[in-house]
Amino acid sequence: MRLNTLSPAEGAKHSAKRLGRGIGSGLGKTGGRGHKGQKSRTGGKVRRGFEGGQMPLYRRLPKFGFTSKIAAVTAEIRLNDLTKVDGNIVTLEALKAANVITKDIQFAKVILAGEINNAVTIRGLRVTQGAKAAIEAAGGSVEE
């Protein structure tokens, strides 16, 4: 047996009906589209959300909220990520050099998640109260 000799079982595959090829095919003339109307025409589609001229739902509901652009360039740093930084001084540049955060991140905040055992100095990063307590308990410090 070879791959080029394989074929599906007899009767397993049905050829598709060809539209508009005579009345004997069962799909001649209108080709299964019915008579007249927008959906019978070429390119006859209605756009997403169209409700036949009725005011659509997405316009009936009020607008709300916005997407913060600062959130896109802000990262949360776990305590165990601080150990990946070379040296014991953690800055934004040091985190980028250690590939903890991407190059486009402009702000970072250290959060209380994971564990920290070695003493590190946090410089120029925002720190939550719980994370600050954990860093100081491990013998580290937080500088503004």
Curated annotation (Swiss-Prot):
Bias (Basic residues): 32-47
Region called Disordered, residue ranges: 1-51
SUPFAM superfamilies per record: Ribosomal proteins L15p and L18e
Pfam families named in the record: Ribosomal_L27A (PF00828)
MF (Gene Ontology): rRNA binding; structural constituent of ribosome
Keyword annotations: Ribonucleoprotein, Ribosomal protein, RNA-binding, rRNA-binding
Keyword Cell cycle: no
InterPro entries reported for this sequence: Ribosomal_uL15, Ribosomal_uL15/eL18, Ribosomal_uL15/eL18_sf, Ribosomal_uL15_bac-type, Ribosomal_uL15_CS
One GO CC term, this protein: cytosolic large ribosomal subunit
Domain of life: Bacteria
One record GO biological process: translation
Keyword Cell division: no
Similarity section: Belongs to the universal ribosomal protein uL15 family.
NCBIfam families: rplO_bact
Subunit-level organization: Part of the 50S ribosomal subunit.
HAMAP family attached to this UniProt entry: Ribosomal_uL15 (MF_01341)
Protein name: Large ribosomal subunit protein uL15
Taxonomic lineage from the root: Bacteria, Pseudomonadati, Pseudomonadota, Gammaproteobacteria, Pasteurellales
Gene symbol of the encoding locus: rplO
